[in-house]
Amino acid sequence: MSQKIVKVQLVRSLIGTREDHRATVRGLGLRRLNSVSELQDTPAVRGMINKVSYLVKVIG
């Protein structure tokens, strides 16, 4: 059985955001604006996405 994949895109700038939110975005593998990262769909990743939901967009 294959793992479910979630694609996340950084859609807002990190300028002026909290340091722990910047670290969370880096933990998701996102570096610059409009970058996309493919991650396994786990509860930990879902929590990270939820924490910075105002900065990222879930593509699929």
UniProtKB/Swiss-Prot annotation:
Disulfide bonds: none annotated. InterPro entries: Ribo_uL30_ferredoxin-like_sf, Ribosomal_uL30_bac-type, Ribosomal_uL30_ferredoxin-like. GO terms for biological process: translation. SUPFAM superfamilies: Ribosomal protein L30p/L7e. PANTHER family: LARGE RIBOSOMAL SUBUNIT PROTEIN UL30M (PTHR15892:SF2), MITOCHONDRIAL RIBOSOMAL PROTEIN L30 (PTHR15892). Part of the 50S ribosomal subunit. This is Large ribosomal subunit protein uL30. It comes from Ralstonia nicotianae (strain ATCC BAA-1114 / GMI1000). The gene is rpmD.
